[in-house]
Amino acid sequence: MKRKIFFTIVVAMSMIAMTACAAATPTSIATTAPNNNSTDQTAPPASVSTATNTAPPTASSTIDTSTLACGNGSQSAMVTPELTEGPYFTANSPERASLLESGTVGTKLVITGYVYTTDCQPVANALLDFWQADANGVYDNSGYNFRGHQFTDANGYYQLTTVVPGIYTGRKEHIHVKIQAPNGKLITSQLFFPGVAGNDTDRIFDQGLLLAIQESSDGQQAQYNFVVPAP
């Protein structure tokens, strides 16, 4: 009788362990290799000081997907909020998925996500044009440092490799972006960082434009899904 009870307990514990292991297995997300076309750059990268004027935004240990408009079982979503372009946009940026150059300093940041329509359908070949300040809060207004555009893949997926931008007077950390589906409306917006003291003092801060960030082995990883009007 005792041997039978012991055998039953061992079998039950084995089943519990197998269930826990299956639940802990993460779901992988397919990625595409960035198109680093550095030959398109029309100006050499400016030298960047190793000094920074602010610490990187605080990242959690796991990605908070609450700000991702689609991808959580949603069937519909609001169009990505539009914000001012600002004075630092430069047209005709090089096509590339990485804004890093030789000698770039700062906290590495990899942003991934998708472009969806308002009915949460992925948009292939959507334009994403990014620009930002460097780690010291300075824009390159004579060349194309920290500027670049790319297009989503067949699944609407994009990946941007850059650094956490610095702050400057009146603004906290942010990244500018223009999004446009093929033959669609051009949307100009900005992305913000969670956990930044004083975000609410930024005159154009929008909670719906917060990146979902977590720490990685060599910097930070972030996610954001953009939404454009359905055709």
Task: List each model region and its residues.
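Ser/Thr-rich, Proline-interspersed low-complexity disordered segments
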Residues: 11-68, 74, 86
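Beta-strand-dominated extracellular/periplasmic modules and repeats
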Residues: 37, 53-210, 217, 221-231
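Bacterial N-terminal signal peptides that target proteins for export
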Residues: 1-9
